[in-house]
Amino acid sequence: MKIFAHLSWLYATTIIFISLTLVILTYWLLPRPYARKISAWFVRLSIFFSTDIQGVEDPAAQMYLINHQSDLDIGIMETISKKDLSWVAKKELFDVPFFGLVMSMPEDIPIERQSKTSLLKLLKNSKDRLNKGRVITMFPEGTRSRNFKMLPFKNGAKVVADKYQLKVQPIVLMQTAKYYDIKRFYYKPGRIKVIFMDSFIADKSDEKWLSNLRIKMQKVYDDELSNNLSHR
């Protein structure tokens, strides 16, 4: 059984790399965001995962905050949202050959965790993308979480949302690492639950709204885990 899961992971990973090549080859031929959307759908259809959506995507949302467990997470969001998403990711990923090109071409936003000027650059780049009608999309944990518990949220999301008084929509992805886990070389097809929570306007007078949001998202995750046998 493990051998089959490893072979499935190899197949899925190959498909993902092909999809990244597809982004590069089609980016200048298609209006944004279609190169990335087509690439994401190519992955979704080729590796046979589907989604079960709860709640409604807010058409007026300007920022998405999403929990992060798997490399599938970006592809999931790109297939369920028609919006032009601008992903915020650590700068080191932009420096990786090939993969960095896939992120820099669509004008995703790099962030340097140790840089004193990083937040200023983040604010400037975010404003530029918002002016282009794009949605700032972040994994506020900063990296993949494990063991069903979300990591503390980084403050960058709050800085941007507060500065521009953005309408924020939290989104909970359920157990995506159960289906694709690069550390275990594991993949299995499945139906992934996506929960759109209620959106809100960022209130900079509330210093704890981001940490409180993590608690709310964790509760949504825990409740879904407890009430839905398919997650076990």
Where are these regions (language model features)?
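Short glycine/serine/threonine/alanine-rich loop segments
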Residues: 49, 108, 166
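Generic preference for hydrophobic
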Residues: 53, 64, 87-88, 194-196
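Short acidic-hydrophobic, aromatic-tinged amphipathic segments that line or gate anion-handling sites
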Residues: 53, 109-112, 202
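A transmembrane-helix-recognition feature enriched in membrane-embedded lipid enzymes
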Residues: 1-52, 101-102
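Catalytic core of membrane glycerolipid acyltransferases/transacylases, capturing the structured
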Residues: 17-29, 58-116
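Non-catalytic C-terminal accessory region of glycerolipid acyltransferases
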Residues: 120-232
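A short beta-turn/loop motif at secondary-structure boundaries
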Residues: 55-59, 186-187
